[in-house]
Amino acid sequence: MTHPALALIEFDSIASGILAGDAMVKTAPVARIVAGTVHPGKYLVLVTGDVAPVQEALAAGLASDSNAVVDHVFLPGVHPQVPDAIAAARQPQIDEALGIVETSSVAAAIHAADAGLKAAQVTLLELRLADGLGGKGLAFFAGVVTDVEAAVDSSCVAIDSSGHLLNAVIIPQLHSEMAANLVEATRFRTLIS
């Protein structure tokens, strides 16, 4: 999923989300649309492609039913690690430090991940979106302490005004047992099955 621009709209109504997704692809020739349900009863519409069509599609989606929009994000120069992480790619390595940004929306987590990656030389260990999190989002950054601090700070600044930032922590020298758990999986059930 490598395209220069990415937009995502998060809806609290499945019907409104489907309506918006239809309007988005009818309005502009985006390269790709991915849409579907996530917990708890939300609907996500993600489009990628060239900047202008993605921006047009986003505007059409937001206009279709603005009352059902929980949050949205538009990234005209999305960092390459973000689409990979959305597609569930994980980077199984924690270096010197771990940074975690917790959000109340999927869109805010994606925005935070992009901002953090652009601010510092870090790896996006994982981007967790909604399912198994009660609709929350989590961005996990790994790298040297100063870079992780810069990534987390930039993430927080980028999404602070949205009201969707729940928490952000930096853990230098993560204990090896905790690191092993996080590298294997961040879902509890995955680790015990």
PLM features: residue spans?
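Long, contiguous binding/interaction regions
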Residues: 2-41, 56-88, 96-136, 142-193
